[in-house]
Amino acid sequence: MTNLLEASIEQAGYTSRKKVLTDVFLEVRKGELVGLIGANGAGKSTAIKAILGLSEDFKGHIAWNDCSFAYIPEHPSFYEELTLWEHLDLISTLHGIEESEFAHRAQSLLQTFSLDHVKHELPVTFSKGMQQKLMLIQAFLSKPDMYVIDEPFIGLDPISTKRFVDMLKAEKERGAGILMCTHVLDTAEKICDRFYMIEKGSLFLQGTLKDVQDKTGLEGQSLLDCFYKAVQGDRL
């Protein structure tokens, strides 16, 4: 299976002169959804920044292998003067999407996430949930080879969560790779093919759910139970 992303992070980021992240190595393959999980402050966001080329004091190597990608950040951000539709039109222009195809994709996504009625309004006035849905729409619009997603479930209602998960599954089937950072382990357990667990700035556990269960000695138990045992005990 083709690797879309190969990340070798020897070190990245500093807090009070201390390295935030050391010796994290991960890869994402075509048609695969990979979960990046860890406690608050473990170094997940620093890993994402390093992968995107935004981390200070980075040492290592990031290989995208000629693939396009879309980034969905944890905190939505929009141009104050642009409407929802103008945001989508800008993305379409940047990615060279033909006008007819853009209109079809945009309208379909707006209907899926129930934002069609506000497409000519300013996103900066939207609720957190509506802004989060627009961030998802912007990423899905370009149909990239890979997605890097940071805490996507924050602010989403149950219906939007279900539709988002369905979209991820469809993109996987299309062949897209997905790296998703999340605290929502019950959902991650159901949809992720593999996991990378970061604790105290280092990669300490990785593999499929079965691998994680075997390494923690919790056969048949939930990802949350395995994660709790792993971070509370010795590194495995």
From Swiss-Prot:
InterPro entries: AAA+_ATPase, ABC_transporter-like_ATP-bd, ABC_transporter-like_CS, ABC_Transporter_VariousFunc, P-loop_NTPase. The keyword Transmembrane does not apply. Keywords: ATP-binding, Nucleotide-binding, Translocase, Transport. This is Uncharacterized ABC transporter ATP-binding protein YthP. One of its GO terms (molecular function) is ATP binding. It comes from the Bacteria. ATP binds at G38, A39, N40, G41, A42, G43, K44, S45. Its EC number is 7.-.-.-. Residues 4-225 form the ABC transporter domain. Pfam families: ABC_tran. SUPFAM superfamilies: P-loop containing nucleoside triphosphate hydrolases (SSF52540). CDD domains: ABC_DR_subfamily_A (cd03230). Belongs to the ABC transporter superfamily. Coiled coil: none annotated.
